[in-house]
Amino acid sequence: MSIFSLYTRVLELLGKEARLGWLLAFANLLLAASQFAEPVLFGRIVDVLSGKSVAGSSSAWPFLAAWVAFGLFTIACSALVALQADRLSHRQRQAVLTDYFEHILQLPLTFHSGTHSGRLMKVMLNGTDALWRLWLGFFREHFAAILSVVVLLPLSLYLNWRLAILLFVLCIVFTALTTFVVRRTFGMQMAVEEHYSELSARASDALGNVALVQSFVRVESEVQGLRSVANQLLEAQMPVLSWWALVTVITRASTTITVLAIFTLGIALHDQGLTSVGEIVMFVSFATLLIQKLEQVVSFINNVFMEAPRLREFFNVLDAVPAVHDRPDAIDAGRLSGLVEFNDVTFSYDGKRPAVEDLSFTALPGQTVALVGPTGAGKSTAIALLHRAFDPQSGFIRIDGMDVRGVTLTSLRRNIGVVFQEALLFNRSIAENLRVGKPDATEAEMRKAAERAQALEFIERSGGFETNAGERGRMLSGGERQRLSIARALLKDPPILILDEATSALDAVTEVKVNAALDEVMRGRTTFVIAHRLATIRNATRILVFENGRVTESGTFDELVAKGGHFAELARAQFMVQEQSRANTRASVTAAETIATAAKSP
């Protein structure tokens, strides 16, 4: 994407503010014309004062009055443009930031798993700030500066083409110098932004794992790593700053050289009667004005160039396409009963190896279907397809007889509740976390859901529903977080429930409490359970055994054990361990009883 096309897109993002942008552009055109008038009037006044008649008038007062009028107009118009440009840029920055935030929340989990959240935050804030600066600078002064140059050069030719040549030479030098520096530093600035991204990601990574950093005494190491990246950033930034500092120095030198050149040529032309003192003064003012405007144009180009890497990153994220979206004819499904059908469903992440292949099964309303198999067998993919994290490449999934692709994502996901392996909580109050399931839930409804999820006791003990859960729920224990997520699912009251290893990370005592809560939330719902611990799915209506993306066995727990297949091997392995543990416990108890009996004997 070239600098021009990049900036065109920046202006396209004005959206609803584009009409105000056009009005500001017109106001800038008027400002450019009025700024050109001032040096002309100044020159005419000098000519009159030096005894030369101008336009048939020997009085300077009419020119002075016109100058005052143009000055007042310029002041008023500049103030209005600055005020409206400020408001436009601030309003649109907030609008774009909100749109970006909504966009990244809709991107697939595969995108988020491969992109650091700290980088996404950095891209969002840096990108919207870059847009704000460019909009503000463009409408406040840069567009007026560009128009001033466009207006001034041809009119200076009309007034005195000999002196105007010097102004054209000045523009050519500026253009050549700016083009050279932009090309020279383009790659350098890209490297600078890469270092900024690395710096942001590294800092975010360390701050997100403070407990790990402190427990493994990694503070100094992490600081040293960040310092190393910061030093690399400075090394990459310094050459860019040096080149643009050179532009500034040459710009200032050009002011002096151009003014001296105009005076030198002007005196020579005056001696030959080819110009007046007023015209010399006029062109000195032109040169000063032109250099001022060229500096603003160079500043504009520099700003676009410096912001380009940030904007490219921003647009790259903005251009990322959500994996799924609503069809134009998608309908609101309303409240579903929970009949789920998979028919010959095949899906591949990379287009080569299928994650699930020819998957077919039916879950009736109220049934519990367990998905069992090794990691990577396709269990989580099947569930992801159910709530349309992705769409299958072939086959279809129906709920209550409706293809899930034919209903809106909002209505589909409103009918599905998920209890994750790791309870996901916001750094907000317990009440706000519960209301994720039902935004308009009353306190009475939250209390009832918490009680059913066996969470009310610890909520009241910790200070009530307004207690903050901490970042990612760290103010609560693992079991408390999980019971909150179950209460959240109860509040949502979906007809379809997904339990993704909901108790695998809990201790035995906590697991008993959570399982009791899960029994409550599963009642009367179509439930899909992803499980490795087979004891948790003993009472499932149906168990699907996954291997390499296919269902290789299907049936109840007892039926699958009786078949003697892969599931039976898993069951024997897990329950043999449990039986051995119980046997060891019984042996320990027996030994203790024997010792106690012997001690009592005379």
UniProtKB/Swiss-Prot annotation:
Record's catalysed reaction(s): [(1->2)-beta-D-glucosyl](n)(in) + ATP + H2O = [(1->2)-beta-D-glucosyl](n)(out) + ADP + phosphate + H(+)
Cellular component, GO annotation: plasma membrane
Domain ABC transmembrane type-1, residue spans: 21-306
Main location: membrane
Annotated InterPro entries: AAA+_ATPase, ABC1_TM_dom, ABC1_TM_sf, ABC_transporter-like_ATP-bd, ABC_transporter-like_CS, NdvA, P-loop_NTPase, Type_1_exporter
Domain ABC transporter: 340-573
Enzyme class, spelled out: translocase
Biological process, per Gene Ontology: transmembrane transport
Alphabetized GO MF terms: ABC-type beta-glucan transporter activity; ATP binding; ATP hydrolysis activity; ATPase-coupled lipid transmembrane transporter activity
Subcellular localization: Cell inner membrane
Membrane topology: Multi-pass membrane protein
Transmembrane intervals: 22-42, 63-83, 141-161, 163-183, 240-262, 280-300
EC number from the UniProt entry: 7.5.2.3
Binding site for ATP: G373, P374, T375, G376, A377, G378, K379, S380
Keywords: ATP-binding, Cell inner membrane, Cell membrane, Membrane, Nucleotide-binding, Sugar transport, Translocase, Transmembrane, Transmembrane helix, Transport
NCBIfam families: chvA, PRK13657.1
Assembly information from the UniProt record: Homodimer.
Family: Belongs to the ABC transporter superfamily. Beta-(1-->2)glucan exporter (TC 3.A.1.108.1) family.
Domain notes: In NdvA the ATP-binding domain (NBD) and the transmembrane domain (TMD) are fused.
Role played: Involved in beta-(1-->2)glucan export. Transmembrane domains (TMD) form a pore in the inner membrane and the ATP-binding domain (NBD) is responsible for energy generation.
Name of the protein: Beta-(1-->2)glucan export ATP-binding/permease protein NdvA
Gene this protein is translated from: ndvA
